[in-house]
Amino acid sequence: SFATWSESESRGGFNEEELDATEIGVKYKSSDNRLVVNAAYYEYDYTDQQQQIIVVTQSGSLAGKTFNAGESEMTGFELETKYAITDNTQIDFNYYSSDTSFKSFVIPTARPPLNFTGNQMNYSPESAYNIAFTTVSDDDSSILRVAYSYKDEYFMDPSNRYISMQDSYGVANVSYTKYFTDDWKMKIFCTNCTDEIYKTQVTTFAIPYGGGGRNYYANARRIGVEITKTF
């Protein structure tokens, strides 16, 4: 088991961001080294957390600026496991849960003034997990990997406006790598195999400028073959 506490600062041309971090957890490894389990509970308390937001200034212009959220916090749980089914095959499973909130976040200099107090922190799904299956041939000449990851819905902007929300989604990836020699290999792959449509970033515009935003999406399904020669 373990317990840690740390304090850190992030500097810039604005108030320093301060973080008090506390973690309590356990680590386990079986006697045959086939099973590894790490679990931890954490609490992160931020003071003046730095956030980049596009706002309308008092002069009426649109500007992207860095602001300090007065108080914000994140609590959660992490679980990481590895299990070797055989000498050649392993399963990895990771799970994360978090509860986040801006305890105090007001921008009085924006027009109109903005109040994000009580909102969920951006890019913070309540739960997420990923699982992967990896098997290696007896002679180490080929590797098959199948992976799936999932995230609950979350917001990409501290305003928590609907346009910045990403619905829950899952992504599957598959790859097979064959080593012919020390310097030649071939990889057959499929990324985002179910062709999931999901956002990777959202730029939101201030309400006096229409209140809309610009969405950036992940790559669609890709299937291909890579042949690599190293020198």
Predicted regions and their residues:
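Surface-exposed loop and edge beta-strand positions of immunoglobulin-like domains
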Residues: 15-17, 27, 42, 70, ...
